[in-house]
Amino acid sequence: MHFAKIALFTSISMFATAPVLAQAPQIEKNISMAMALAIIQGTIDQCTKDGYKVSVTIVDKGGNVAAQLRGDGTSPHTMEFSRLKAYTARIRNQTSLQTMKELEDPARAPLRQIPGLVGVGGGVPIKAGNGTIGGVGVSGAPGGEKDEACANAGIAKVEAALK
């Protein structure tokens, strides 16, 4: 009899809690291919106008490369460096220039242990509302501030879609 009560209680508990455990699928914003290409084009246009030859990388919400372009006449290292800058901006939810300034503080030294994190300007997070959905990394202009200005120009091309 005691076993029957336990079995009945267990069965009722399982059926009563099943609907509570069921949840709707999670829906997240992310970078589309069209958006990535528009950002790259806007970035390249600005840097070309300013006289810089750059490479540009767009990473998605997960930090994975969504699109990458090596500009004409750029050094080979600019592809990887632009990826690292984009990744840094994405995972830190701030510009890589801000990360560079943070790393100057000895108390923030443990940040240097994060694989793929770089403290050099040129990476800008792509934000949609309050969330970060990707990052842009630019490498090749003479200085991270100039790379960052080009990245901001690229993001401005898709600003309406990010609201």
Question: Which sequence ranges carry the predicted segments?
Answer:
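Bacterial N-terminal signal peptides that target proteins for export
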Residues: 1-8
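N-terminal signal peptide c-region/cleavage motif recognized by signal peptidases
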Residues: 16-19
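Flexible, solvent-exposed loop/hinge segments and secondary-structure transition points
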Residues: 21-163
